[in-house]
C-alpha cells in the first residue's frame, strides 16, 4: 500500500475560503501514523445555519483559532512527499486552493 494523507475541510459558510476546520490522517506502510485536527478562524468569519447543522461548529468554537496560514505552516511539513486524498476531493481541493489564493500563498504541488 502506498503512503498518503487523507484530508477533510469543513467550511463556515458557502465560500470555499471559509475553512473552519481541517482533519488529516497520515498513512504510511498501511498504518495510520498521525491524526491531525485543527480549528481555523474562517475568512469570511461568519457561520450559516446550514453549515453548522452539518458539522456542529459555530463562531464561538473558532473565534480564538489561528488563521489558515498559521495552521498550514504546522501541517505542511507533515505532508511533504505524500499524495493527498479526500472523500469529496473537488470540494476539499477547492477549499485548499481558495485559501492559498486568499492569503497569497503558493499552492502545493
Regions inferred by a protein language model and the residue ranges of each:
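Conserved non-catalytic scaffold segment of RNase H-like nuclease domains
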Residues: 1-109
Amino acid at each position: 500500500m502506498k503512503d498518503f494523507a487523507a484530508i477533510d475541510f469543513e467550511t463556515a459558510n458557502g465560500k470555499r475560503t471559509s475553512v473552519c476546520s481541517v482533519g488529516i490522517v497520515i498513512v504510511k506502510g498501511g498504518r495510520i501514523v498521525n491524526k491531525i485536527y485543527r480549528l481555523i478562524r474562517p475568512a469570511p468569519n461568519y457561520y450559516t445555519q446550514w453549515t453548522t447543522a452539518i458539522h456542529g461548529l459555530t463562531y464561538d468554537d473558532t473565534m480564538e483559532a489561528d488563521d489558515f496560514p498559521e495552521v498550514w505552516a504546522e501541517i505542511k511539513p507533515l505532508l511533504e512527499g505524500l499524495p493527498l486524498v479526500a472523500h469529496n476531493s473537488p470540494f476539499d481541493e477547492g477549499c485548499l486552493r481558495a485559501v492559498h489564493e486568499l492569503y497569497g500563498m503558493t499552492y502545493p504541488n
